[in-house]
Amino acid sequence: MNATVKCTLLIILGVEIIIGCLGNGFIAVVNIMDWAKRRKISLVDQIFTALAISRLAFVWSLLTVLFTSELYSALMTTRKVLIIFNNSWTVINHFNIWLATCLSIFYFLMIANFSNSIFLSLRWRVKTVVSVTLLMSLLLLFVNVLVINTFIVISVDVYKVNTSYSSHSDNNIHISRIFLFTNTIFTFIPFSVTLTIFLLLIFSLWTHLKNMQHNAKDSRDPSTTAHIKALQMMVTFLLLYTIFFLALVMQSSKMKFLSSTVFNYFFEVISLAFPSGHSCVLILGNSKLRQTFISTVWWLKSSFNAAELPGP
């Protein structure tokens, strides 16, 4: 039974890796080619490109850790390897999460309708707001890495004192839980920001529709359409984000059955669903990416049909 479940999870994992690489690679290539052609790039395209690159790195880092832990499990007990892997994953995951949060902030400032002077000031300085948010997040990244490295050093030193097999296994589980628990705490901050933005967008849409009804105007104006489109993307993003966050919470818990190999693969599948699935949402939600994707599909279809035609 476990072998069947494990095989199924590996197939799903493989599909997610392919989707993640193709989807995020597509976003990065399209925006970089457009940048090279126009000699300029908009703020939202900058965020899209950086997010796509960070998610490509996330997919490959997760794949590297998975293969290393399966094939060279002894390496995962050394301090140097643990620090390299954990720090790499922490940094990549940090930018993956915070760039997505910055994208939410950008959409909120550009779409929401509030007459508050502070909000209007932030809207006019949206590029500065995004830049400052990323810079401030680096402080959290520094603290996150510092805490994780401290726990790794302490845990490895304890393991060296007691080198029995059971202590080796327990120590690996302990390090993993500390690592995941720490990342869960630091992931909760951008998650809270994104959730707040989502609620504010709903409130903005509600007040906008209320004003439209009061003025007896058509509710299907450009602002309403933009609100609904942004909320649709945010709902999907929040759903994937919530699943990813809950997976971190469960992995960092002390329930022993969650330490089994099958559950480890299950959590890997959940972790990859966020960067892989959200890339598809971004492509479908962005007009330039969507049109380029459709054109690419039609070109590939035409090329395939032409190749199948028999020669004279």
From Swiss-Prot:
Residue spans, topological domain Extracellular: 1-9, 68-90, 155-184, 251-264
GO CC annotation terms, alphabetical: membrane
GO terms of molecular function: bitter taste receptor activity; G protein-coupled receptor activity; taste receptor activity
CDD domains with a match to the protein in the record: 7tm_TAS2R14-like
Any Pfam family the entry gives: TAS2R
Main subcellular localisation: membrane
Membrane topology annotation: Multi-pass membrane protein
Tissues with expression: Expressed in subsets of taste receptor cells of the tongue and palate epithelium and exclusively in gustducin-positive cells. Expressed in 15% taste bud cells in circumvallate and foliate papillae but only in 2% in fungiform papillae.
UniProt topological domain (Cytoplasmic) ranges: 31-46, 112-133, 206-229, 286-312
Biological-process GO terms, alphabetical: detection of chemical stimulus involved in sensory perception of bitter taste
Chain positions carrying an annotated carbohydrate: N2, N86, N162
SUPFAM superfamilies for this protein: Family A G protein-coupled receptor-like
Compartments (UniProt record): Membrane
InterPro entries to which the protein is assigned, alphabetical: TAS2R (IPR007960)
More info: Most taste cells may be activated by a limited number of bitter compounds; individual taste cells can discriminate among bitter stimuli.
Function in brief: Receptor that may play a role in the perception of bitterness and is gustducin-linked. May play a role in sensing the chemical composition of the gastrointestinal content. The activity of this receptor may stimulate alpha gustducin, mediate PLC-beta-2 activation and lead to the gating of TRPM5.
PANTHER family on file: TASTE RECEPTOR TYPE 2 (PTHR11394), TASTE RECEPTOR TYPE 2 MEMBER 14 (PTHR11394:SF23)
Name this polypeptide is given: Taste receptor type 2 member 140
Organismal lineage: Eukaryota, Metazoa, Chordata, Craniata, Vertebrata
